[in-house]
A protein has these predicted regions:
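Hydrophobic beta-strand segment of the Class I
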Residues: 480-481
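Conserved glycine-centered beta->alpha loop in an early N-terminal alpha/beta scaffold
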Residues: 98
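Conserved helicase motor "Helicase C" RecA-like lobe of SF1/SF2 P-loop NTPases
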Residues: 568-575
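Conserved beta-strand signature within the Rossmann-like core of class I S-adenosyl-L-methionine
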Residues: 508-510, 551-559
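Nucleic-acid modification enzymes, centered on SAM-dependent nucleic-acid methyltransferases
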Residues: 2-95, 105, 109-473, 491-525, ...
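A short glycine-rich, Lys/Arg-flanked "PGG" loop and its adjoining helix->strand segment in the class I
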Residues: 533-551, 575
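Conserved SAM/SAH-binding loop
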Residues: 101-102
Length: 666
């Protein structure tokens, strides 16, 4: 679909603007059962349900199906309120003051709304602009193929090897490394497992094929190869065994190459002299030609970043093997030659590819199911330090995880095609089927100011901004729909530094890269818990100011087990003069997610529907009984009810905090 065709789609979708009423459907009803069923399905593979929102890495994304359900309950025309009906919010203005992964913006623009999005962090803003902009997929393909060809000319020679069977030139897919550890007066190499691959028939490929003596000799040095289990048994797993005096990537020794021969197909091999020569050549070239400014890549203090510093890593570029640094540097150089309109999405694609192309990547190809060989950097929402590290070939031509080409096909091509014809899942006759929502698109047109929204649909106004002070007129927004920070989720902002330093290099003039991350509504420590309520209170006050009356509503999802989190949230809403109109509960997290497995975790979100406080005096909420037993659904439901009751009471901050503590004492 080119620009002309897209303009025709916008024209075809023009309908009379939605006529909002004094009462809002979500005040009284929400299809919890239907929303819960879809959210549970989506939680297993969110990126497949909403591919156009997953251009770049972000954390703690909320369910797209849940937010579609929320927005559908704002539709005044009952004939368009069904989940599978197109549109319904034409011309309505939706604000998200903390856009994060961009879920609200995408879901609202599909329904015909005009959207405003702010975030203090530049990455959500850049991603929203790139994923909502209507550049045709075919045009992006032309730009990408040209970029890829030029990149291959520059770096392809560093990712070649030879077939161990016929000696033909072959594409290197990835290289596996073992971690150097100190064992008394000598060094050993520690790997996660000696097994390289388990085939479907039960046979195994192991390192013993290539190192039958259990030792590797490389560049005049010899190491014994042991597993992490053996290392643990021998006590080679404490700080004394760490080798921190050498650069991070030099703590790893290459063991095995995986490649592809056009005749003999996939293979493993140990490194031969030519492979070693190629590695050394890349190391020399990178050392001579790549000079990233240290001040732009210095690792800041932070709960997760400190894990890097404790391993004597102080600059983000130290986390990349020489070939990976060449990939980044040459990509940066080529970026300066592509048309400006394509620089944003291409830079985001390169940035997100680094999660699959860093020395922190691990190996998971041992599993016979093999859902991709690469364990990406943030697979556990933290910095993990693998024993078996995997250096990927970003230009490997075959379909495999982590390559730039595969990411382009999934996050640009597939996402762009989906955006032109969004697909939902529907439960029919005891099975899920895919259904295209006719006359919807997940694309918009960027506005330069709020005045551009007049008599328009699917306009977006997105900018990096501290939402404690929003550049919007009073009574200018119909609904605020958002997902606030998780009280103490400082690790997400901290982990994002891994990408920010590179995006700042690729896009130096497109954001304020010097913003103060500590201005966000996150409690960095127990001593600073009140900051969450203070900052959020200022944001909620601004939301109250910009909301139209009488239909304006503030709606967001939230869950937390900590009574102080609920107390601070309630205090913020109280100061901003909001009352709770209704609360609903819907499934949120995948119960087998590695991030919540085996934890006393909440698997549901409370959907909170609030209205600006008015003259009405009638009280709506009854005080619930204290929670004694932990059950995710009941817990979230009760927390919503308690918030409603507290907001109607005249309680001091101290009494409010104590009420929550007593309520959640179980």
């Amino acid at each position: 679909m080119d620009a002309t065709q897209l303009a025709l789609v916008y024209s075809e979708l023009e309908t009379p603007p939605a006529r909002l009423q004094k009462t809002v459907p979500i005040d009284t009803t929400f299809p919890e059962e239907e929303a819960n069923r879809l959210a549970m399905m989506e939680s297993f593979n969110k990126h497949l349900f909403r591919p156009n929102t997953y251009l770049h890495k972000w954390w703690a994304r909320r369910s797209g199906t849940t937010f579609r359900h929320i927005l559908k309950q704002l539709v005044p025309d009952i004939s368009k309120r069904d989940y599978y009906s197109a549109g319904g919010l034409e011309g309505v203005t939706i604000l998200d003051p903390m856009i994060g992964g961009g879920t609200t913006l995408h879901e609202a623009i599909r329904l015909g709304a005009n959207v405003i999005g702010y975030d203090i962090d530049p990455i959500p803003i850049l991603q929203a602009k790139a994923s909502l902009s209507s550049i045709s997929v075919s045009e992006k393909e032309q730009v990408y193929r040209s970029f890829e060809r030029e990149l291959a000319k520059r770096i392809g020679k560093y990712f070649k090897t030879s077939c161990p069977t016929c000696d033909r030139s072959a594409d290197l897919q990835y290289t596996l490394y073992g971690l150097r550890k100190r064992a008394d007066s000598e060094e050993v190499l520690v790997v996660d497992s000696l097994v390289l691959r388990e085939e479907s028939d039960g046979t195994q490929r192991t390192l013993n094929e290539f190192y039958p003596s259990g030792q590797i000799h490389l560049i005049g040095k010899t190491w014994k190869i042991i597993t992490k289990g053996e290392a643990r048994e021998k006590g080679i797993n404490g700080k004394n065994s760490e080798i921190l005096s050498v650069p991070f990537t030099e703590r790893y020794v290459p063991l095995v190459i995986a490649g592809y021969c056009p005749v003999h197909q996939n293979f493993f091999k140990s490194l031969d002299s030519q492979d070693v020569k190629l590695l050394l050549s890349a190391q020399r070239w990178a050392g001579r030609n790549i000079k990233f400014p240290p001040s732009s890549f210095e690792i800041p203090n932070g709960p997760k970043s400190d894990d890097l510093k404790n391993r004597n890593v102080h600059y983000f570029y130290e986390l990349f093997f020489p070939r990976q640094l060449i990939y980044i540097a040459e990509s940066q150089a080529i970026l300066t030659t592509i048309p400006q309109k394509h620089a944003l999405w291409m830079s985001l694609l390169l940035s997100t590819s680094l999660e699959f192309n860093a020395a922190l990547c691990g190996y998971k190809g041992v599993d016979k199911r093999r859902p991709g060989a690469i364990r990406h950097v943030f697979s556990h929402h933290a910095y993990s330090f693998p024993y078996t590290a995997l250096e990927n070939n970003p230009l490997f031509p075959r379909h495999t995880s982590g390559t730039l080409g595969n990411l382009f096909e999934n996050r640009i091509v597939a996402a762009g095609e989906w955006a032109k014809a969004p697909i939902e899942r529907r439960y029919v006759n005891h099975r899920w089927i895919k259904t295209t929502i006719q006359n919807e698109i997940d694309l918009g047109q960027e506005a330069s100011s709020l005045s551009a929204f007049s008599d328009q649909t699917r306009m977006f106004l997105v900018s990096q901004n501290d939402s404690k002070k929003m550049p919007l007129p009073t009574n200018s927004v119909d609904f605020v729909v958002t997902d606030p920070p998780y009280f103490n989720s400082v690790q997400y902002s901290d982990l994002s530094h891994f990408f920010r330093c590179w995006l700042r290099t690729f896009l130096p003039d497109q954001s304020n890269w010097q913003y103060v991350a500590q201005s966000s509504a996150v409690a960095e420590s127990e001593e600073n818990e009140a900051k969450f309520g203070f900052v959020l209170g200022q944001i909620w006050q601004e939301c109250n100011r910009v909301l139209k009356r009488p239909h304006g509503r503030l709606i967001f999802t939230y869950h937390h087990w900590n009574p102080n989190a609920w107390a601070q949230l309630t205090l913020a809403l109280k100061k901003a003069r909001f009352l709770l109109t209704n609360a609903f509960v819907v499934h949120s997290e995948n119960p087998i997610s590695v991030h919540i497995m085996n934890l006393r975790s909440l698997k549901h979100d409370t959907i909170l529907v609030l209205r600006p406080r008015g003259p009405q005096k009638k009280k709506h909420w009854q005080k619930p009984e204290p929670i004694e037993d932990f059950d995710s659904y009941s817990f979230c439901k009760a927390c919503g009810n308690m918030m409603g009751w507290i907001l109607e009471q005249d309680l001091s901050e101290q009494d409010m905090t104590k009420t929550w503590a007593d309520f959640l004492k179980g």
